């Protein structure tokens, strides 16, 4: 049985990353909405005193 050549692993790795970055990632990130902090209301939580069960 012939042995496979492990030489082009670097080329395959770079090509797979470029395919992911330039083809797949823009399509995947178009479905995800960004959570911008400017749209959030500033709510400050006031701490409530803890009621201990033995008091």
Curated annotation (Swiss-Prot):
Top-level division of the source organism's lineage: Eukaryota
Organism: Struthio camelus (Common ostrich)
A GO term from the CC aspect: mitochondrial membrane
Annotated compartments: Mitochondrion membrane
Protein name: ATP synthase F(0) complex subunit 8
Protein family per UniProt: Belongs to the ATPase protein 8 family.
Transmembrane annotation, as ranges: 10-32
InterPro entries for the chain: ATP8_metazoa, ATPase_protein_8
UniProt record, GO biological process: proton motive force-driven ATP synthesis
Bilayer disposition of the protein: Single-pass membrane protein
Role, per record: Subunit 8, of the mitochondrial membrane ATP synthase complex (F(1)F(0) ATP synthase or Complex V) that produces ATP from ADP in the presence of a proton gradient across the membrane which is generated by electron transport complexes of the respiratory chain. ATP synthase complex consist of a soluble F(1) head domain - the catalytic core - and a membrane F(1) domain - the membrane proton channel. These two domains are linked by a central stalk rotating inside the F(1) region and a stationary peripheral stalk.
UniProt keyword Transport present: yes
Location, primary (coarse class): mitochondrion
GO molecular function: proton transmembrane transporter activity
């Amino acid at each position: 049985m012939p042995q496979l050549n492990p030489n082009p692993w670097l080329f395959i790795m770079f090509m797979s990353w470029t395919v992911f970055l330039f083809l797949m990632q823009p399509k995947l990130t178009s479905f995800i909405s960004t959570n911008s902090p400017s749209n959030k209301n500033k709510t400050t939580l006031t701490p409530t005193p803890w009621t201990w069960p033995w008091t």
